[in-house]
A protein has these predicted regions:
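Extended hydrophobic secondary-structure segments that form protein cores and membrane-embedded regions
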Residues: 1, 11, 72-76
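Conserved catalytic cores of phosphodiester-cleaving nucleases, focusing on short active-site segments
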Residues: 2, 7-23, 28-38, 58
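Acidic, metal/cofactor-coordinating or nucleic-acid-engaging core segments within structured domains
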Residues: 30-120
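C-terminal edge-of-domain segments
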Residues: 123-136
Length: 136
C-alpha cells in the first residue's frame, strides 16, 4: 500500500523469470563455476492467474475501504510468454496477459483441458472492471 494524505493505493507486483545463464569474468578470468543469473519460474499460466487474482484483490479493497482509491498490478518479466498471445486452444487463455489484450468484466475460468488439480486449487473468479494489458 502507498499512502498519501489519508488515501491509499494498492500495489501488487509479480516477478516472473526465465533462466539467464551467462559466463562472467572476474579479475580478468572467467568464473570457474556455473553461474545462473536468473532462475526459471515455470507455470506461467498460474502466475498469470495469480496476477488477475491480484487485480481482483485491488477491486475488493476499493469496494470495502473508502480510503483505498485504486491500485496497480504489475508483472516484471523477461519471459515472452506473458506478452505474446497464446494459441486459441490454450487452456489458460482467459488468464492471458498478452500485449493488447483487454480483460472485460466477467468470469475468468480455465478451459476444460486444464488438470482437475489446478481447478481445485485455482478456482474461477469474476472481475468487475475493464483492464487493458500493455507491455513496454
Amino acid at each position: 500500500m502507498v499512502e498519501r494524505l489519508g488515501e491509499f493505493a494498492a500495489v501488487e507486483l509479480k516477478y516472473a523469470t526465465r533462466p539467464v545463464d551467462v559466463k562472467i569474468d572476474r579479475f580478468g578470468e572467467p568464473l570457474r563455476t556455473h553461474c545462473l543469473i536468473v532462475k526459471n519460474q515455470a507455470a506461467s499460466d498460474l502466475i498469470m492467474y495469480n496476477y488477475w487474482k491480484d487485480v481482483r484483490r485491488i477491486e475488493a479493497l476499493t469496494q470495502c475501504y473508502p480510503a483505498v482509491k485504486g491500485g496497480v498490478a504489475l508483472i516484471v518479466t523477461n519471459n515472452v510468454t506473458y506478452w505474446r498471445e497464446p494459441r486459441t486452444d490454450s487452456g489458460y487463455r482467459a488468464f492471458s496477459t498478452y500485449d493488447g489484450n483487454t480483460r472485460s468484466p466477467g468470469l475468468l475460468q480455465w478451459d476444460t483441458d486444464i488438470a482437475e488439480s489446478v481447478r481445485r486449487t485455482h478456482s474461477d473468479f469474476e472481475l468487475l472492471g475493464t483492464y487493458p494489458c500493455r507491455w513496454a
